[in-house]
A protein has these predicted regions:
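Structured interaction patches on ligand/partner-binding surfaces of diverse proteins
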Residues: 471-496, 581-588
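C-terminal outer-membrane/trafficking sorting elements
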Residues: 1-5, 14-15, 504-514, 518-588
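Active-site/substrate-binding loop(s) of hydrolase catalytic cores
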Residues: 178-328, 335, 339, 343, ...
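Short, acidic Ser/Thr/Gly-rich low-complexity loop/linker segments typical of extracellular
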Residues: 429, 437-460
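Active-site-adjacent mobile loop/cap segments within catalytic or ligand-binding domains
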Residues: 296-320, 352-411
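A short, amphipathic beta-strand motif
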Residues: 417-424, 453, 492
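Bacterial Sec-dependent N-terminal signal peptides
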Residues: 2-3, 9-52
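A short, solvent-exposed beta-strand micro-motif common in secreted/extracellular proteins
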Residues: 453, 462-472
Length: 588
């Protein structure tokens, strides 16, 4: 043992017995500390398992570096960062897989809902300071349609795993069918315990419908847009404790699957969470493919921020081609919200109130990325309350903060370019025409015309060179100017490179489809199993079905006299591989 005194060094010799004693004491101290750590982790594991046994899901806080979160996000359902710890939800399987990582964690008690005041009738929802029971929720959606049949239509997206209804209210001035209307989709509570948005969207339905006659901004909005509103995307999670209460609401669905990790992912493919598609996921995917939304917002709780794409990439890895557009509409929304809210609202994630999804934290399988990447629908995720299920008496405050912003978000995001694409000779509308903004790298995220020939492309103000393209047609180039806060409408006529309809009727293979003109029956012979639909000149599907190999007789007595198009599809039913024209002509 050495010790210095000034310029002298003194040497002390400790007895060997004392050195051994010190060594043993040090080892003992380490063992004691390790035992405390093990005991602590065992206690946390016991708490987590108790939550899992009671609720089927548990919340944990995990100590992990940013580098470890890539692996972590594929095993658990990350829900944000608290200091230097990551908040995550786990089910039984996820927790077992997580334990193999050997990371430190602790159990987080589930957020207590201080006051779950439930409405047992529609009249009890008049003050908007209660949560509806499941039956009242369904009754409210039906009541909107019954009271305002000219302004809304109630649609069923599908059924949950437990058979509860996934409802959507289509709100628009349906008497005005002359203009092309962009389709906007609001949905909430894909995580069943995030219920601020559920009540807020119910109130949005009520406000739009009751204000239509008296508010010119609302009437103008509904005359030019179709707004789809699904207040509750995960009813099994919201009413996990039974249809009469949301007191035991949980994040996951009935199978303890996070629905916002269950969609196809741009990086990890069809099943990023290693789970089968849930009934809710399939329903929303099919509904989105059918309706072909232009803009969408998925409302969550647990934070207060506008989250724009991507979720699976950080901004340094890949940016959405419409990043500037996303930032513009999000900034407008934040400005509207801060006009009516406390100064610290929408500041818990970033002071601006806006974040890139992956820069906040990376996840895979989100609906936002699915809509943007696979369906070309511009969607953001909107987190509206740090408390996932606030006490019911606070719910009116959130409408005060958000009401104007939610209405204006629809208006602002549906500005740009819209119109109809038609065949220049027959004037038949054209489906699946690609609309490409030239001189801009759109990263293959082009929009396409719909079955009725209509299209919408969200754009900031400016002048754009636009190309319309479709197999069998010459490319069409036009110059479009979009004014500030305006929408430019263009009818685009495209010239076919195929033979004309008249020529096609003269040279058509009579052994394939006959007679032509037809009376009450049409015969078609095909070489492989196919699916078909029949559309009119507006692109409206009037009839559809399946065709077997060989001769098929199709009854067309329901069709009026006129010219129709039959489209044949393969088993994927995605794009027609053959199009034929026939005439329905009943002679008297």
């Amino acid at each position: 043992y050495f010790r210095g005194y000034g310029n002298k060094v003194c040497v002390f010799f400790l007895p060997l017995r004392q050195i051994r004693a010190m060594k043993i004491s040090f080892i003992s101290l380490i063992l004691i500390l390790l035992s405390f750590v093990c005991q602590s982790q065992n206690e946390e594991r016991t708490l987590v398992e108790a939550q899992l046994n009671k609720q089927g899901e548990a919340i944990i806080l995990i100590k992990a570096t940013d580098e470890q979160t890539d692996t972590l996000s594929r095993l658990v359902s990350l829900d944000g960062k608290k200091g230097n710890e990551w908040k995550a939800y786990v089910n039984q399987k996820q927790f077992a897989d997580f334990l193999n990582l050997g990371l430190d964690y602790r159990c987080l008690p589930k957020e207590e809902t201080k006051s779950v005041s439930m409405a047992n009738s529609i009249s009890q929802m008049e003050s908007w300071n209660r949560y509806p029971t499941y039956d009242v929720y369904v009754d409210m959606m039906k009541d909107f349609e019954n009271r305002f049949p000219d302004l809304c239509r109630l649609d069923t997206i599908g059924l949950s795993e437990n058979g509860r209804l996934l409802l959507c209210l289509q709100v628009s001035d349906f008497s005005n069918s002359e203009t092309v209307k962009p389709k906007f989709f609001y949905s909430s509570s894909i995580h069943g315990d995030e219920l601020t948005g559920m009540v807020t969207l119910l109130r949005l339905c009520d406000s739009l419908l009751t204000s239509f006659e008296s508010d010119s901004e609302i009437s103008n909005l509904l005359s030019s847009t179709v707004i789809y509103i699904c207040p509750l995307a995960n009813p099994d999670g919201a009413y996990a404790g039974g249809n009469s209460t949301v007191a035991n609401a949980r994040r996951y669905n009935a199978n303890y699957v996070d629905l916002n990790r269950n969609f196809p992912d741009p990086i990890l493919g069809l099943h990023p969470d290693q789970e089968e598609f849930q009934a809710e996921t399939m329903a929303f995917m099919n509904y989105a493919k059918k309706e072909r939304f232009d803009v969408s917002v998925n409302i969550h709780g647990g934070a207060e921020v506008c989250n724009y794409p991507w979720d699976c990439w950080q901004s340094g890895q890949r940016e959405h081609c419409d990043k500037d557009w996303f930032l513009e509409i999000c900034n407008s929304f934040i400005s509207d919200v801060r006009e009516f809210s406390p100064i610290d609202y929408f500041t818990d994630v970033s002071y601006s109130g806006i974040t890139n999804g992956g820069d906040w934290y990376v996840i895979n399988g989100s609906r936002q990325d699915y809509h943007n990447y696979f369906l070309r629908c511009r969607e953001i995720t909107l987190e509206i309350s740090t408390s996932k299920t606030p006490q019911a008496s606070l719910l009116p405050r959130y409408w005060l903060y958000l009401g104007k912003g939610l209405v204006n978000f629809v208006s602002n995001s549906t500005k740009g370019m819209k119109g109809i694409v038609k065949d220049s000779v027959s004037s038949l509308v054209l489906d699946s025409v690609r609309i490409e903004i030239e001189n801009i790298n759109e990263d293959e995220l082009f929009v396409y015309s719909k079955a009725d020939g209509s299209y919408f492309r969200a754009l900031l103000d400016g002048t754009y060179q636009v190309k319309f393209s479709k197999d069998g047609y010459e490319d069409k180039h036009i110059c479009v100017s979009v004014a500030s806060n305006g929408t430019t409408e263009e009818v685009v006529l495209m010239k076919s490179t195929d033979v004309s309809i008249e020529q096609a009727l003269q040279t058509m293979d009579k052994s394939l489809i006959y007679p032509n003109p037809a009376n009450d029956f049409l015969t078609i012979e095909i070489n492989s199993e196919s699916y078909y639909d029949v559309i009119d000149s507006r692109g409206i599907i009037l009839q559809q079905g399946r065709l077997d190999v060989g001769r098929n007789n199709i009854q067309i007595t329901n069709l009026q006299n006129g010219t129709y198009i039959m489209r044949l599809y393969g088993k994927d039913k995605k794009h027609p591989n053959k199009t034929m024209t026939f005439i329905k002509q009943v002679t008297k």
